């Protein structure tokens, strides 16, 4: 591995960040370095205590407040360093939504009911806060690098008046329409969970011939075979609209299934050494029912491939209670093998590692501000910091703690985001920073004596499906 090449790329990437920050570029570079090198900060203001942060703590909030980035700012910065897929014949985009709980921010605007997992069984997994949609690039495994990496490209807050899946749809459309990025010209696969299998989302992306959508579907869905008219009905002239759907294909009813058009068997070994047999079945050219409201969605024009995946243990028993159902929709879906489809959907879970790392190590949801714009800017900064850690993945050295030295992952020396963050302070000391040293200008006069700021107004909590709103 040529360490000089990776070091040069990291320097160029940091210089590009510095040159494209419109306001307070020196402060933002120092803040990003502090975020990437301090894994145990408890609050955002603690980043001012890092050795690489040369300024006072108040400049952190001024820089966050004045941050202005374009919609495709981060994709343009990482575009020259995107690793072209070699094992896969496609680019992989992962879309998902995560929550930012803010139940006690009574003056924060546009809060709604969002999902939050609960440890205690029986409690409603609901809290008050915001939702953010993230689109990341799925990456192929690299030697010496952990497979949990993704490359975040876009982050956008989901307003209470918007559909979270359609926000992700809009983000992917920007990536597909940008000519400076390779996604619109090459075969691109997007993956999502069951909420992304709705007709509105699938229909919106059919205008891109190079885009293939892989989405999980619930086990109670119902699809249809294409309608094939008989000879008698062909001779008989009928009035009205021609029939579009054939026999029913009900996922919970195996009696409605036909023989699959394609099958494939894989063997997998877990981390604990258990061997599993994966059976993949596919039915081609199925149809789903469309919608008439709020707009007409003629889904009968877009056939798809239905995939059923079942995993068996060494004794032949099903490893999971329910099978995994996937739909594959797009003009170029036939270029994907069943193994490609299976591997692409497995990579969807890598974005969960990014959310977990961001919340635990980068304070993704810990910036307590009453301003929506500042919260959105902070989310953008966390995505940029994670991208900088990804750029340093080949430069960092694995630094396990004393009780971690004998772990299998440490013996393999696979650089994960956590290990790169531990070593990032050393990297910065060796490479230096493009930021200029601060120029103290003395103490500010501050507010005049006797000045009192008005109280912030309390905001309503948006509860969908009800006429009245709830007071926080």
Name each model-derived stretch.
Residues 1-17, 21-24, 40, 106, ...:
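Single, function-defining residue in the core of a domain
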Residues 64-146, 152-153, 292:
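Active-site-proximal, Lys/Arg-enriched surface segment
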Residues 1-66, 72:
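Gly/serine-rich nucleotide phosphate-binding loop at the start of the catalytic core
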Residues 51, 64, 96-99, 139, ...:
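Short, flexible loop/turn elements at secondary-structure junctions
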